[in-house]
């Protein structure tokens, strides 16, 4: 998640704060907050609160209720599995389209992001790896030139990244992801749409399995009521 700047819209700053509150449990699942209460708490007007909640609703983090503000649904394994189902379908589509139209210059850019991710993985730098992973996939998605699919993926990337930062990676997961990036890159270089789609889907499935394992471990460590 990029640090806010002077030009960052108020709703985006608030959205990031609320996302963090949801993920760290300070806005607990099953509880609702009104627009007015959120505006007062964060010293902003109603308008950025409404925009922030709409953005978080698009990520699946809140449900907006008429006259009740927003409620945080239960963050469970099914939610994460569903998100990765969506990512797998869309990122395989985008990789297929990218393989059909990628240029040598674009390949160089994608390769640079893959190399940066691998370097971060070798240093076990999860935060840097996440940034470079996002850049790698965004570069591929941009080549695919399907703004509708890109928008859906992008709307959920910040949530998935925030969850990943909280849960961490399993042993050798980042290095495995680096190898998977190289497989995707090889398919793009070969201009092989099917191979690119298959490699992208396998990459998402591998990430899904690792994140669900980390989530199960975290749930197992929580004290029982």
Model features per residue range: what roles?
Residues 63-65, 133, 176-178:
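Short, flexible turn/loop "capping" segments at secondary-structure junctions
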Residues 76-77, 163-167:
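Short alpha-helical transmembrane interface motifs in multi-pass membrane proteins
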Residues 83, 104-165, 179-187, 195-206:
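Conserved amphipathic alpha-helical segments that form helical-bundle/coiled-coil interaction surfaces
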Residues 1-100, 212-225:
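Short linear motifs at protein or domain termini
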Residues 98, 144, 167-168, 215:
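Helix-loop junctions at the membrane-solvent interface of multi-pass transporters
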Residues 24, 28, 55, 142, ...:
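Conserved amphipathic alpha-helical interaction elements at protein-protein interfaces in regulatory
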Residues 40-41, 172-225:
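C-terminal regulatory/effector modules of DNA-binding transcriptional regulators
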């Amino acid at each position: 998640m990029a640090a806010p700047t002077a030009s960052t819209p108020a709703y985006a700053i608030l959205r990031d704060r609320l996302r963090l509150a949801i993920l760290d449990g300070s806005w607990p699942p099953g509880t609702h907050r009104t627009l007015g209460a959120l505006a007062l708490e964060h010293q902003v007007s109603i308008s950025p609160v409404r925009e922030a909640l709409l953005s978080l609703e698009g990520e699946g983090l809140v449900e907006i209720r008429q006259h009740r503000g927003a409620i945080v649904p239960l963050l469970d394994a099914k939610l994460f599995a569903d998100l990765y189902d969506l990512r797998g379908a869309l990122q395989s589509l985008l990789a297929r389209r990218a393989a059909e139209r990628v240029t040598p210059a674009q390949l160089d850019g994608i390769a640079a992001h893959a190399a940066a991710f691998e370097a971060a993985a070798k240093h076990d730098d999860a935060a840097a790896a996440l940034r470079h992973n996002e850049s790698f996939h965004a570069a591929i998605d941009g080549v695919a030139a399907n703004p509708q699919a890109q928008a859906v993926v992008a709307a959920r990337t910040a949530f998935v990244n925030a969850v990943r930062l909280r849960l961490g990676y399993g042993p050798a997961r980042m290095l495995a992801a680096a190898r998977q990036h190289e497989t995707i890159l090889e398919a793009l270089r070969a201009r092989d749409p099917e191979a690119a789609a298959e490699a992208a889907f396998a990459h998402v499935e591998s990430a899904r399995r690792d994140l669900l394992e980390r989530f199960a471990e975290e749930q197992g460590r929580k004290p029982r009521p």
